[in-house]
């Protein structure tokens, strides 16, 4: 059985928290650093199902779930900087997280994200990957590469159009007005509840204006710095999971991502984006089994 402890950590743009899950009866092999999904517009760090937390911690992988600031109050550059800061805090101040004996080195770590959280973890790792261009000096980088990356239905904006065109799936839902954006906090914040923030994501995908809510610079810089298109190699192995009929992120995006980085693949049937929310399904059980097998190959 795991324990749970929440701490405050320094944020670049606002106060933020991290929640640590650990099984005290199991020897820790490596630490999973987790970043939630939500299209950069909504979500909360403590969104992992109980089954995931129980299996990871029982297998010797304590997990730290981090906040990060949300759009449109912060843009993708700010968000990415904050995520990299969180990882570097784990590396430089391990005693904060009480995973290991005080004064000892941090455990090896694995980055884990779902949906937009996976996008952010992949971009973070790409900060020390091989590129076909020079990264700007004002973008931070990870101080040390992770042992691996877990990407559940993540993306790198490798396919054209899907993130800029209106989504056919979201257009089947009740139409949301642009006025919904006025209800979102204008100051940086890290929690985006479904009842207040999800409608903004629906509007963004219905209208095809999603990218404009988290990126405001020139188009060429978006593809250079905030996609994976020109990152030719990542410094660690990657495990990617996706459903064939994903309604948010097209399967073709998953195919390009896994081919580009020679990732271990888990393919689920069906159309649900976050298919692992159903923890009773055979697919989710197999996903967790294969994820832990992958983790064991790293450490």
Where do the PLM segments sit?
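Primarily recognizes the serine-hydrolase "nucleophile elbow" in alpha/beta-hydrolase
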Residues: 92-172, 176
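Catalytic histidine-centered segment of alpha/beta-hydrolase-like enzymes
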Residues: 271-284
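Alpha/beta-hydrolase active-site loop
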Residues: 74-99
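N-terminal cap/lid segment of alpha/beta-hydrolase-fold proteins
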Residues: 1-27
